[in-house]
Amino acid sequence: MPNSQAKKGLFQFYPHNLIWLGLSVLAIVLDQWTKWIASTHMNYADPVPVLPFLNWTLLHNYGAAFSFLSDAGGWQRYFFTSLAGLVSILFVFWLLRMPKKMVVLPVAIALILGGALGNLIDRITLGYVVDFIHVYYQNHHFPAFNIADSAITLGTILLLIDTFFLEKQRPKNSDA
């Protein structure tokens, strides 16, 4: 007799995965809070030294990562907004379908999702992304970034670790 409790199909999800959405929300809240602090307490493009290799520098990014396409004429705002929205929807479905025994992969997806939505909020409400973390060494400057970018980067690193090292150790059929 088939299990009537078995969840199948596109909208299958497991309640235990709501905790991962909580991690995404935490990333969004932390990102938006720090951007608000930077925007209300800093002057645009005026560096505030923190450490010998770190400044807080309020900047507006009209492009993608590292200001890619920031001077492309305006179409990139709609492109990146649409792309982030679509990827976020796919990530929510993927996240909610994670088997219970998995940890690294859902953390990775939750961080990427939270970072993408944090920057998406900026694009929709401001037309640009607020960046304020500026790391440098002598005359070598890394492009300014924010907490959302950090969440996306950490999530991507965890996703690569999961893909290349942990996936091989998982049983083929992991149940939730």
Swiss-Prot record:
Q: What catalytic activity is recorded? A: Release of signal peptides from bacterial membrane prolipoproteins. Hydrolyzes -Xaa-Yaa-Zaa-|-(S,diacylglyceryl)Cys-, in which Xaa is hydrophobic (preferably Leu), and Yaa (Ala or Ser) and Zaa (Gly or Ala) have small, neutral side chains
- EC number(s): the record gives 3.4.23.36
Q: State the UniProt keywords alphabetically.
A: Aspartyl protease, Cell inner membrane, Cell membrane, Hydrolase, Membrane, Protease, Transmembrane, Transmembrane helix
The similarity annotation says: Belongs to the peptidase A8 family.
GO CC terms on record?
Answer: plasma membrane
Q: In which pathway does it act?
A: Protein modification; lipoprotein biosynthesis (signal peptide cleavage)
- Entry GO MF terms: aspartic-type endopeptidase activity
A single BP term in Gene Ontology? proteolysis
Topology of the protein relative to the lipid bilayer: Multi-pass membrane protein
PROSITE patterns per UniProt: SPASE_II
What are the TM regions of this chain, as residue ranges? 10-30, 48-68, 78-98, 102-122, 141-161
Supply the name of the protein: Lipoprotein signal peptidase
Q: What is the role of this chain?
A: This protein specifically catalyzes the removal of signal peptides from prolipoproteins.
Report the subcellular localization: Cell inner membrane
Source species of the chain: Acinetobacter baumannii (strain SDF)
Instruction: Report the active site residues.
Output: D131, D149
